[in-house]
Amino acid sequence: MAAGRLRGLAVAGGGESSESDDDGWEIGYLDRASQKLKGVLPTEEKNETFKKALTTGDISLVQELLNSGISVDSSFRYGWTPLMYAASVSNVELVRVLLDRGANANFDKDKQTILITTCSSRGSEEQIVKCVELLLSRNADPNVPCRRLMTPIMYAARDGHPQVVALLVAHGAEVNTQDESGYTALTWAARQGHKNVVLKLLELGADKMLQTKDGNIPSEIAKRYKHLEIFSLLSLSLNPLKGKLQQQTKEETICKLLATDSDKEKDHIFSSYTAFGDLEVFLHGLGLEHMTDLLKERDITLRHLLTMRKDEFTKNGITSRDQQKILAALKELDVEEIKFGELPEVAKLEISGDEFLNFLLKLNKQCGHLITAVENIITELPVNSHKIVLEWASPQSFTSVCEELVSNVEDLSEEVCKLKDLIKKLQNERENDPTHMPLVEEVSTWNSRMLKRTAITVCGFGFLLFICKLTFLRK
């Protein structure tokens, strides 16, 4: 009878899991009419039916079989449990049912844990996040490694899941753990070219200077695999958020990480931890506050926003008008390049006064740009040394360069003073030179002044003559 119920199965071979292809599962379709248990089945047939119900994701049949006495931690071929399989296909509801029935969230087969299986599954990131959260809520250990010493966070980073990475860290996952090859989660993300994961790991305190056993750091790995944008990011980026999470309790981090809808029927949406204080200030200054929710939803940080290309702006739903504002702001931050080759050749004797004045004005403008650049650097540098993320060289090298800069500025000041004194000297000599010919403008001014005086004198004599004549006639 039971065998007849199973004849309706059309079985197609297939395997699951990341680390193991020998899980013994067959993927097939189970006819709904054959899913109802009409009698007591032998244990072997129950197990087979249980496997098929798990394969098709039939929650009701799984619950019936569990009610009939099948162990929730049944061991199938090659030692896989029902929860291990449900996690490998990111079936959220099936994982929930099995955990509610008491399935062991810390089960492992040859050091392949259920959490590792979930993080390396082929489901969507949304499904994986929900499954991982369920497992962590049942005290699954996020730091248990597989045989290759890879932890769940490494698998999540390797497969490009920044929200999963943040969720694991919020529950105590070690960010800088290394596998048997010396790879960290950041190294895996750099190797696979997952920019969003790299940015997230940097925020969470990942050390980008840890070397693999071959002596390579993440930026070098990114360059080797031709992920040049990530190479530049890891080579140049500062990380002011490093260590922020380590200073918080686990509960505080989880509160910032998880924003759960009060209605559990609405897909149990979880949002990953983000630190948007600097981003919100930047957007507010540009009048783009309306973009805050959009960027939060897409887990975009300020550093990510400032390194976006035009196609990434469009892909993330940023309008052309908003793009123009952001790009204009970035352009204003750039200091104008100093091009002294464009300045006039002041050494030529035939240079005009206007050209020389133009030279001085340009020189003054370039000095202003240099002052602005230094002011910007002073503003951006962290006040406290513990906020510096990059491995800096000895401070003595920086101070020595600054001392040279101060010396050069003093030399420049001295030379400008010499130039000013020279100009004053030339001006005085010119005024005292008897052979000096006045400029055309000066001659014209003197002639017009004399003409005015003559005209006034003639008018005065004429008026006086008129008065005298008038007086004589009256007499």
UniProtKB/Swiss-Prot annotation:
Q: Which residues carry this modification: Phosphoserine?
A: S17, S18, S20
Q: Where is the composition biased (Low complexity)?
A: 1-10
Region: Disordered; residue ranges are 1-24
* InterPro entries for this protein: Ankyrin_rpt, Ankyrin_rpt-contain_sf, Asz1_SAM, SAM, SAM/pointed_sf
Q: Where in the cell is it found?
A: Cytoplasm
Answer yes or no on keyword Repeat.
yes
CDD domains, sorted: SAM_ASZ1
> What are the recorded Gene Ontology BP terms?
cell differentiation; male meiotic nuclear division; regulatory ncRNA-mediated gene silencing; spermatogenesis; transposable element silencing
Indicate the principal place this protein occupies in or around the cell. cytoplasm
Q: Short name of one Pfam family for this protein? A: Ank
Q: Which GO terms describe its cellular component?
A: pi-body
Location of the SAM domain: 272-334
Q: Where are ANK repeat segments found?
A: 45-74, 78-107, 110-144, 148-177, 181-210, 214-243
UniProt cross-references to PANTHER family, sorted A to Z: ANKYRIN REPEAT, SAM AND BASIC LEUCINE ZIPPER DOMAIN-CONTAINING PROTEIN 1
- This one is known as Ankyrin repeat, SAM and basic leucine zipper domain-containing protein 1
Species this protein is from: Carollia perspicillata
- Source species taxonomy: Eukaryota, Metazoa, Chordata, Craniata, Vertebrata
Coding gene? ASZ1
